[in-house]
């Protein structure tokens, strides 16, 4: 049965997920706050700033009118930058009140809210009371929009405490190149999704400095240990971190030239200033803000996260990357598994 799905956010991932939903025989409305982007998608069926050369289905409808996008939708998918999640949720709840709708909410954004350090599902649940929505489901895992656009094989996770809602999202997105697994551990899935971006900056920096595979593998492995420690402290299942949204997402983000966070770290490793890197990228680098959140949460919980602290020192305290690497290597000997 055809369902109307509203996708909020027409960046790389949002527009490609809209394409998946359209291909799976849904009526898809793609909301953007840019008139020029909506016009390009509707008239040329392209999104050149985000996915150059990709042709979108002519049946996807783009709009800057949130009410038009959401009216009659059985599900609403958030794929907007973390910094505007709360604002968009506030706008959405007013529309839902007016329309008298109660859709399933899905989000595929990765990061934490700046300042509060809250997970994205927490922010959405705060701003959209349960009387105006069904469950909130997290869609996350090792995925690059460019590869899904080419219909490369991709596996990700739909997480919700209510597995029936996770299974609903599974059925909406799954096809012959995109496979969805379900998980009840929302905390673990969102934690892995957010904090892997921090480690990707570090791995990118190692590459920029000319370090080899050994160093990168070590940083990824010890970085995963830090992510797991922090997630478990907040109630996550440790097994989640060896799944798609944990080690899977970490691998793809730390090893691919598609990764914005890896590319940012790579440029830092080559000696570029942070401000210059941000300007050159022209897109959101979630790991920069998430690093600050991870560092502050680790301090609050008294959790040892030396790699995160080193990356924080480079990003926020202007420390030299090579000096931070030396300090990490000079730490006293430790047991690996503890």
From Swiss-Prot:
Pathway: Membrane lipid metabolism; glycerophospholipid metabolism. InterPro entries: 6-PGluconate_DH-like_C_sf, 6PGD_dom2, G3P_DH_NAD-dep, G3P_DH_NAD-dep_C, G3P_DH_NAD-dep_N, NAD(P)-bd_dom_sf. NADPH binds at residues 12-13, 34, 110, 145, 260, 284, 286. One of its GO terms (cellular component) is cytosol. Sn-glycerol 3-phosphate binds at residues 110, 141, 143, 196, 249, 259-261. It catalyses: sn-glycerol 3-phosphate + NAD(+) = dihydroxyacetone phosphate + NADH + H(+); sn-glycerol 3-phosphate + NADP(+) = dihydroxyacetone phosphate + NADPH + H(+). Signal peptide: none annotated. It is found in: Cytoplasm. GO terms for biological process: carbohydrate metabolic process; glycerol-3-phosphate biosynthetic process; glycerol-3-phosphate catabolic process; glycerophospholipid metabolic process; phospholipid biosynthetic process. Disulfide bonds: none annotated. Keywords: Cytoplasm, Lipid biosynthesis, Lipid metabolism, NAD, NADP, Nucleotide-binding, Oxidoreductase, Phospholipid biosynthesis, Phospholipid metabolism. The active site is at residue 196. Its EC number is 1.1.1.94. One of its GO terms (molecular function) is NAD binding. Gene3D superfamilies: N-(1-d-carboxylethyl)-l-norvaline Dehydrogenase, domain 2, NAD(P)-binding Rossmann-like Domain. Its main location: cytoplasm. Catalyzes the reduction of the glycolytic intermediate dihydroxyacetone phosphate (DHAP) to sn-glycerol 3-phosphate (G3P), the key precursor for phospholipid synthesis. Belongs to the NAD-dependent glycerol-3-phosphate dehydrogenase family. This is Glycerol-3-phosphate dehydrogenase [NAD(P)+]. It comes from Ligilactobacillus salivarius (strain UCC118) (Lactobacillus salivarius). The gene is gpsA.
């Amino acid at each position: 049965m055809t369902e109307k799905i509203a996708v909020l956010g027409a960046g790389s991932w949002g527009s490609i997920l809209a394409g998946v939903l359209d291909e799976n025989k849904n009526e898809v409305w793609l909301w953007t706050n840019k008139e020029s982007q909506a016009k390009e998608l509707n008239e040329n069926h392209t999104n050149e700033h985000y996915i150059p050369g990709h042709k979108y289905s002519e049946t996807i409808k783009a709009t800057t009118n949130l009410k038009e996008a959401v009216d009659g939708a059985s599900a609403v998918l958030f794929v907007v930058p973390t910094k505007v999640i709360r604002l968009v949720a506030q706008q959405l709840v007013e529309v839902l009140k007016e329309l008298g709708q109660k859709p399933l909410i899905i989000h595929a954004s990765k990061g934490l809210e700046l300042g509060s350090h809250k997970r994205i599902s927490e922010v959405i649940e705060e701003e959209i009371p349960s009387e105006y929505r069904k469950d909130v489901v997290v869609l996350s895992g090792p995925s690059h929009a460019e590869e899904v656009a080419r219909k490369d094989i991709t596996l990700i996770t739909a997480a919700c405490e209510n597995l029936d809602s996770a299974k609903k999202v599974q059925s909406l997105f799954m096809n012959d190149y995109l496979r969805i697994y379900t998980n009840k551990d929302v905390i673990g899935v969102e934690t892995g999704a957010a904090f892997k971006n921090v480690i990707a900056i570090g791995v990118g920096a190692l590459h920029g400095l000319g370090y080899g595979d050994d160093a990168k593998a070590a940083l990824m492995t010890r970085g995963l240990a830090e992510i797991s420690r922090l997630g478990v402290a907040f109630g996550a299942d440790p097994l989640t971190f060896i799944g798609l949204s944990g080690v899977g997402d970490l691998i793809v983000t730390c090893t691919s030239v598609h990764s914005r966070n890896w590319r940012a770290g790579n440029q830092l490793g080559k000696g570029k200033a942070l401000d210059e890197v941000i300007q050159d990228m022209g897109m959101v680098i979630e790991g920069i803000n998430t690093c600050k959140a991870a560092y502050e949460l680790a301090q609050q919980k008294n959790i040892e996260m030396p790699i995160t602290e080193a990356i924080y020192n480079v990003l926020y305290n202007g420390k030299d990357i090579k000096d931070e690497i030396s300090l990490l290597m000079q730490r006293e000997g430790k047991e690996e598994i503890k």
